[in-house]
Amino acid sequence: MRGILLAGGTGSRLRPVTWAVSKQLMPVYDKPMIYYPLATLVSCGIREILVITTETEAAQFQRLLGDGSQWGLRLEFAVQQRPGGIAEAFLIGEEFLAGGPVALMLGDNLLHGVDFRPCVQRARETAGGHVFGVAVADPSAYGVVEFDAAGRVLSIEEKPVRPRSPYAVPGFYLYDADVVETARSLRPSARGELEITEVNQAYLRRGALSVTLLGRGAVWLDTGTLADCMRAVDYVRAIDEGQGIKIGCVEEAAWRAGFLDTAQLRALAEPLMSSGYGQYLLALTGDGLSRTPQWPALTAAAG
């Protein structure tokens, strides 16, 4: 399975900050925002990833991330010429995907406290689409998934006025190879975009959409506004200062996934020692702990 990391958009809700820098390059505590979703993909065992950006910001992302080889990854880059919707990512990445399954993650989403590997492995082996559900206070601001007592998906709607469930769909999606043709069949919405919710609805109509609910201990932060960004900073800082854990550390995720050996991790730590980030990486190599983080199991799966 290959990954797509969508880091396009104009960041209009964060202006004037985003006049000068991409939203996904803004710092969230001690690292760029893009590190957090990238680390999630890497922690799932995905090492071939296409980063989709705007044309004006492509060089900045390439300067930050390089080709990924320093982390044992293979990163490629592509441009979304205008805001064409999340689902357009599958058309942009068609050649990169090479007819295989895909994990798509939005570059402004932070997910923590969940082991997604079982779901990713299942998606590698089975046909269909897979989304996640997180209970939120105001689901009307998000895509919302509804399901019955048996766990079957009944509906999925984008920002409904009257939500049919409290479960929002975060920006992490798993699909089989059919997603490219599904996206190609869509018509632009009223705002001129190919909507990810319509992709999910197409899978639902075929009886091929499943959902996994993220339970207690799972954290989802969508950094769409400045207030959201500050909440993300507060959360990352609290975990760092309280538990000594750096969320969204790509180097650590790659090491734990087996993409880097310990000597390579130490080498990455050296030029970062003055910031404290390097000291954290160096400490990992001698902590005597298992490389595999122990996250709570996903609480419910439906299909």
From Swiss-Prot:
Where are the coiled-coil regions? none
User: What EC class does the entry list?
Assistant: transferase
Keywords, A to Z, come to:
Magnesium, Metal-binding, Nucleotidyltransferase, Transferase
Q: Which domain of life is it from?
A: Bacteria
Family the entry assigns = Belongs to the glucose-1-phosphate thymidylyltransferase family.
- Known role: Catalyzes the formation of dTDP-glucose, from dTTP and glucose 1-phosphate, as well as its pyrophosphorolysis.
Task: Read off the PANTHER family from this record.
Answer: GLUCOSE-1-PHOSPHATE THYMIDYLYLTRANSFERASE (PTHR43532), GLUCOSE-1-PHOSPHATE THYMIDYLYLTRANSFERASE 1 (PTHR43532:SF1)
What name is this protein filed under?
Glucose-1-phosphate thymidylyltransferase
| Taxonomic path | Bacteria, Bacillati, Actinomycetota, Actinomycetes, Micromonosporales
Give the gene symbol. acbA
